[in-house]
């Protein structure tokens, strides 16, 4: 991919969004993700990376190479939260619309206990969650603005089915706030939720509790207590954020989706508000196992608009049908905004069918010779031009393991050798070259952080904290 987003020749002007499709073992990590990560030494076009890292191997193998080129490394680990930096989704709320975006991302990728798919329950849950999170953001101390406090509020919201005048502690909080700030966004949303009768309100609370159940695990509470990822600074300085997730258990993958949702929105807003529409450092998202992280809300709109802000998304899938399963009718819109598409090999029928059609046909010359023998022998030659698939589905299914097919917008598809990672100048810094280069993530996280002049800190009075 070219580094510049605005080449002088318009025919070369393409976005950096990439769709990579390859079956298991086709080399998606070795032949695409690692070579792109090692392109970290450009001085004229600095790049930050956000990498979905199944099993946590990519950060271990390439971390030292990034450190040598001045990168700040961040790790969020949903396999082992004790070996992770902290991520607090509420730390990135700056306005009422941010509250709505956070709740949308949460509800899109988690399940409540609503009844029969009735949209009423989702809407009611949304009202309650928006009101509680808005209350925490605008009224609670910074150290209490997290999901642990949100769960504590839910746990105190007892409902009486018989006594409509009964008030739980949270009702009293909002009643008091309503007297002080009657036009508060949190109060207005909570009043709408309180229109529900006692039995209905109890069902809403049960559904919210089920949706937030993962945050009740102590490890998750600790991991989301405060924030260290600094998602809003990815476009300010060279940073590599590794999102480590399990490729066999999707329980906590919704956190990864929430990170991507907030990341795209934060960076787009920052580019528009502070940098005149263009981030100083390009942010490239290498989303491996894209189908397993859940749905990123409005992705079809984001991939169409992030290019101008110096952001790009590289979606890595095993099959195209995975994208359709998650994004339904919007999958075609997403693919349409990927100016580069790479096929590394595979045998899934839908993928092969779509690719064979995209490759088109070639013209072949057909010669038919006839030779009739007998009393009146005759000879004839018939010539015609025919259309033939450039590569049929069965040919694509047995594609050489060392080859790939690349489609660039404005250029005919072509077959190429997969990139030899060992030829990259920065390969010598990886643990693939020398096991001594392996990054010990746990040791890295426990090191003493150096303080930089532009770092900001939040001062908290220890005496004001609630008892553990």
Regions found by a protein language model. Name each.
Residues 2-311, 326, 394-418, 422-468:
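P-loop NTPase motor domains
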Residues 303-405:
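Conserved ATP-driven motor cores of ASCE-family P-loop NTPases powering translocation/secretion/packaging/pilus
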